[in-house]
Amino acid sequence: MENTKTNASSSGMFSSSSFSVSYAEEMLLADEVSKINSMSILGPNQLKLCTQLVLSNGAAPVVLSLVSKEKKSISNRMLPKIGQRMYVHHSAIYLLYMPNILKSSSGSITLKLFNEATEELVDVDTDHDATQACIFAGRYPRSILAKDAAKGHDLKLVVHAVASTKANSAVGVLYPIWEDELSRKQILERGADFLKFPIAETEPVRDLLNAGKLTNFVLDRTRLGVGSKSDPSPVLLEPRAKITGKAKTFFIPEGPSVPNTTISGIAPSVRIDAGSPKGLGVPKGFTYESFIKDEILPDH
């Protein structure tokens, strides 16, 4: 098979040069590429979950390429001559959306597919309730040229979120899952709308503490009274001075007097008879003179 290659010269005139290709060799190379694509690491039935997209309220639309780096790498390294004969198919596209906002809030999510090579837009959903979890399922009905995909002119997912919540806060998270198959055959499918499968809210992850555990929780953190104490009922309080009875006078009898003598210059004193019933609790016959002489002045 012979083809003509046209180039632009420096003078601005176009010149042509011919080159020859072998259809058999081209098909053989295309088949080899298809076999590589069927390997487990790049299998055509292997769905890709590359990332998660956090959708912020009022932020710029999020744009994600739906052609994996593996397919672009194959296109760049192995398809310099047969890029026109290799295609990327998107036979399955799933978009799992999980909201971050409550049912009491409001908002909408817009999802579109954009073929950058042809600049065509396909609506996935233009007004999805941002509070509702769901899975979108569909496909792109045309093939993407492998040479375009290698240059980045591939199929893009465009997502935008707007809600009644705080600006730039997380409205929800989108998990794109897709299949990008590299093949030498083109697809020509009827266009179909994406299916939407709502996801119901689940039951609580775990049950709350039972009454016994809650009681123990309170007892561990609360100081409680003991017994059945209760406050008195309010009554009229009348403050009055208490009148005491007649004062009583007590007499402590003196002991018998002692001779008026002087010991070492110390004046005599009265002897205290502590042995009497109303004594002061000191030994019988105790005198301060003897105490001073025996205890305080033993060396004199």
Curated annotation (Swiss-Prot):
The organism's place on the tree of life at top rank: Viruses
Keyword annotations from UniProtKB, A to Z: Host cell junction, Transport, Viral movement protein
Keyword hit for Transport: yes
Signal peptide from the UniProt entry: none
One GO BP annotation of this record: transport of virus in host, cell to cell
A GO-annotated cellular component: host cell plasmodesma
Keyword Lipid biosynthesis: no
Subcellular location: Host cell junction, Host plasmodesma
Family to which this protein belongs: Belongs to the alfamovirus movement protein family.
Annotated function: Transports viral genome to neighboring plant cells directly through plasmosdesmata, without any budding. The movement protein allows efficient cell to cell propagation, by bypassing the host cell wall barrier. Acts by forming a tubular structure at the host plasmodesmata, enlarging it enough to allow free passage of virion capsids.
UniProt-recorded name of the protein: Movement protein
